[in-house]
Amino acid sequence: MATKLESFKVVEKLGVEKGEKGKMMSKKKNVKKDGDESESGFWFRFKFIFSCISSRSKVDSSMNATAVIAEPKKVIEKLEGHPAPTKDTGCAESGSSTPLMSGELKYSSKLRIFMFNDLKLATRNFRPESLLGEGGFGCVFKGWIEENGTAPVKPGTGLTVAVKTLNPDGLQGHKEWLAEINFLGNLVHPSLVKLVGYCMEEDQRLLVYEFMPRGSLENHLFRRTLPLPWSVRMKIALGAAKGLAFLHEEAEKPVIYRDFKTSNILLDGEYNAKLSDFGLAKDAPDEKKSHVSTRVMGTYGYAAPEYVMTGHLTTKSDVYSFGVVLLEILTGRRSVDKSRPNGEQNLVEWVRPHLLDKKRFYRLLDPRLEGHYSIKGAQKATQVAAQCLNRDSKARPKMSEVVEALKPLPNLKDFASSSSSFQTMQPVAKNGVRTQGGGFVSRNGPPMRSLSSLNLPQASPYRYARQSPKPKGKEP
């Protein structure tokens, strides 16, 4: 778990994630932009705590069993000239307060029902030291409970969990909370994060998950100093593909995930990938229908173009999103990065002309790998990405086909760094020094780093690591 000081440095450095969410709402304007570190960590924390406490004070304390829902932050920017349909056929989004009725929750014998005070004790009173991070739903705290019960236990014993609290003024709300329970509470697979249980007490809404010690894929790809080794990247891609394949083809009732991205792929201690955050998930159409019509929701840069333009949602929309994430894994670049030169800001459009070029594909690969990747594996992975990103949704493969294509890749050992043909493929700079992965290297530069998969740092499993107010409740 990231330390408190490290967590706040991450927030100060990153601020609003560039290009990932499309247009951010005005309430985010106080968050620092990338690279702006003019404020001290103490002043940043003070401002954040004060603003969160102020927002909570606005909530009517007389509310009972009502979730205050803010405008969702996951609304996709509508393409100019192609407005999304206004008709909504039951998408999982929030636009107004929704009364909670017990009938809205699907019964699941797999879930534990927690008391608020038990979770308060399990997280050590939601103290800052237990904070893992914050997302659109609210703040997430580390806690410890009984292995097979709901009572809190001493830190370091029992079952380690991640407790997600609903922020009444947050960017996701009641419908997302329900969707998370109704989907994850009834879906069990090694590639899905396990939902342990939930708390629904007065106006408190909390979710309890298994703890994922390695954090998110996003954190490892874009925020860590050491790069993920090639074999680990392929292992993660395969695991995430298995999760989508289960949702689309193996679940009793097929599910469209709708929010597949690197921040929603969490990693356990062995770097096994698991999908999290089912707040935007929807039931897939039955055999009589070709698609689900819904308002466009998701994250800019990952959504399939036909979905953004028409609002028609299918399992092939998830396949496109997988192709984007696979590109991020291969290149080490974000799906949208406004800090890059024109022509390179949109990852898909930048790589599309080169995906099937066997003589130039290596230029797309993350230069931090320094040639430590399988040549055959990289060629196959780029081919799979190209198929998933096909503009014709019907031509995209099923996720089960993607799984079969990726299965051999983590174990291939034909590393480019030991290939003489790879060395001759590298472009030569003006000073006569060959480059790797499209970047220049020094003649007397340091030797290649060891990319062991066993010594990478752990990370918080949630997007933002910020100090946060405690959920409302009486002191014990």
Curated annotation (Swiss-Prot):
Entry's localization field: Cell membrane
PROSITE patterns listed in its UniProt record: PROTEIN_KINASE_ATP, PROTEIN_KINASE_DOM, PROTEIN_KINASE_ST
Residue list for modification Phosphotyrosine: Y209, Y307
Pfam families, alphabetized: PK_Tyr_Ser-Thr
Record InterPro entries: Kinase-like_dom_sf, Plant_Ser_Thr_Prot_Kinase, Prot_kinase_dom, Protein_kinase_ATP_BS, Ser-Thr/Tyr_kinase_cat_dom, Ser/Thr_kinase_AS
Any one biological process term the GO annotation gives: pattern recognition receptor signaling pathway
Protein name: Serine/threonine-protein kinase PBL36
EC number(s) on file: 2.7.11.1
Keywords on record: ATP-binding, Cell membrane, Kinase, Lipoprotein, Membrane, Nucleotide-binding, Phosphoprotein, Plant defense, Serine/threonine-protein kinase, Transferase
Modified residue annotations for Phosphothreonine: T294, T299
MF annotations from Gene Ontology: ATP binding; protein serine/threonine kinase activity
CDD domains in alphabetical order: STKc_IRAK (cd14066)
Modified residues (Phosphoserine): S263, S293
Binding site for ATP: L132, G133, E134, G135, G136, F137, G138, C139, V140, K164
